A protein has these predicted regions:
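Generic alpha-helical propensity signal that fires on short helical segments
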Residues: 9, 36, 41-43, 85-92, ...
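Short intrinsically disordered, low-complexity coil segments enriched in acidic
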Residues: 1, 209-210
Length: 210
């Protein structure tokens, strides 16, 4: 049984989700009641997210299982660059022009071939180091990536163009596709429903949707 459990831990990929104020861990487990084990972590205010993660390794049941593979979903501002205009050596300068306040972060990117863009996003260097020190196989991914892929497939159903809204962490991500490309993508702070509604209607009108 111990050997079997060890093999499952080696094969499984843990998921870490991190935003400005939240941190959680999850893993697919076919023997669990809902086939997924989800563990939110209570973030200590006034302490860096890297320090919170270090402490979580001492407290979290999932982190203490010894997983070697992890995917980290990062909720940070995303810059989309068309594939044909992407040059890796320009990433830092390009991102700093678009978003201020990330000079001390590592700038990462993930190619989105189905959408012909590259998603560029930052991660705190200390947080990145804590992750890489504790896992052998690490994949950093923008939090919107699975949502983009799922809704891009959905966008081909029906004859009308669609505007998608994703609410999370007191924010609103709005995006629209035109075949295999983004027609629109932007993020808004929207702690209240009336703010979200305003942004949705504004973008709807801006895009000329019916």
């Amino acid at each position: 049984i111990m050997q079997l459990t060890g093999n499952k831990t080696l094969q499984a990929r843990l998921t870490i989700r991190v935003s400005k104020n939240t941190l959680s861990f999850s893993v697919v487990d076919r023997e669990a009641e809902h086939q997924v084990i989800y563990e939110p972590y209570t973030v200590k205010s006034g302490v860096s997210m890297a320090a919170n993660l270090r402490q979580a390794f001492k407290e979290s049941d999932l982190l203490q299982r010894g997983y070697q593979k992890v995917r980290v979903y990062i909720d940070s501002p995303i810059l989309l660059v068309p594939i044909e205009e992407f040059h890796e050596e320009d990433l830092g300068v390009l991102y700093q022009h678009a978003f201020a306040g990330h000079h001390s972060d590592a700038i990462l990117y993930r190619v989105q071939p189905a959408l012909n863009v590259v998603a560029v996003f930052p991660i705190n260097k200390d947080f990145k180091m804590v992750v890489e020190d504790n896992f052998q196989d690490v994949r950093f991914t923008p939090i919107m990536q699975p949502m983009w892929h799922y809704l891009h497939q959905r966008s081909f159903t029906g004859i009308h163009r669609k505007l998608y809204a994703y609410f999370h962490d007191k924010k609103l991500d709005l995006f629209c596709f035109d075949k295999n490309r983004f027609k629109f993508f932007n993020s808004f702070n929207a702690a209240h429903a009336k703010d979200a509604l305003y942004f949705i209607l504004y973008v709807w009108k801006q895009l000329g949707l019916d």
